[in-house]
Amino acid sequence: EPGNMAYLDFAGSTYSGSLKPFMMARCINIRKALELLPVPQNVSGEAVLLITDRFLPLNNGLLKITAQNGALTQASTIENEEITMDSAAFTQLYFGTFSFEELVRAEKIKVHNPQKSGFLQALFNKCRNYINEYY
């Protein structure tokens, strides 16, 4: 079926295909990554994200992100979460490996407020990454 991303969970299976990426990424500081995210001028909105990170507690927390006039601000908040994801899903979203909707369908992101989906879809674009390494 088109869009079926079940293969993302098959890494430990004996009878499945395997993915062998040549590059891996991880957002070490999610708050700083959000500060550096380029935002299109026409994207505006806000959402409260609950980010969880099993390995780096610095990244755990509720963040309210606001985009307007080509800038993104983020701040810790005590508001109810509207979107929940772990650091792995955030990294895939941030680098454009998968779109917001693809990660929702794969159950990597949980949406508590569907009205925020359009904003996050516009903020994080799926793209092809070209990585150059120079030694």
Residue ranges and their predicted role:
Residues E1-Y135:
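Intrinsically disordered, low-complexity, positively biased terminal segments
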